[in-house]
């Protein structure tokens, strides 16, 4: 079930790990320890919304470009050049930059379905850019980054496919909509392990404790959690977390879920996610989905029955194809 397309580009093939359901997977043997380390009593936090926070949109913004009608960035200087893709990068001069120290820039070239992502990005004179790191992803491919390489995220994963986007929630809530976003979300933890597991490619920690999650660890909201009492936007996010879960993608505040800013978000609605504590989550073992350690492709597994909880009947394989319309 791929993301709602952006400019006609699906965010990775339908059988990519980001687009795989995990409601039928076994619980990870270290699940209880992982959850305790992140915070059993700590609530979820949507790190996205409408309006501004400290003068910047709330969330990680993205934009599109057309390489056939533009020129690549003339020079781009990376702090971590040895783990960054050389380019060329098609980054519009006015590309939105995430507020705060991460300063992510995400751009989809809709001509080639290529995703460009920068970390700690800053435009310079003459169209040049500087950045901490940069990663280029072919959205039509399941290829992962080289083992051990970072990306614009500490886990070496793409950011954009893990963001909650308002257009997807709107499609989920429309008549005949799915009731959920058909892909995993990205989230952060304050303390991660000095390790990464598939599909992650990089770690950013000195902590060797097996009780804290490695980069790439995947969590899901327990199927027994009643989402029916929640407001619409929060309910879609929670149903998504039951079916597709979320991936540890970076170090940051505990249980912070990534999303793109949009004036359509209802911040009061999303705020209700804070009442969902970590104790309602479990880590899953998704190693059985792996086809090749260097690929994000998944083998098809049929999950067990899942409660509908007022969002419509949901029966599918792990790689169900779903179509969502962009507003």
Predicted regions and their residues:
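Short, surface-exposed polybasic-aromatic patches that bind anionic ligands, especially phosphate groups
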Residues: 1-310
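Extracellular mucin-like PTS domains
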Residues: 312-327
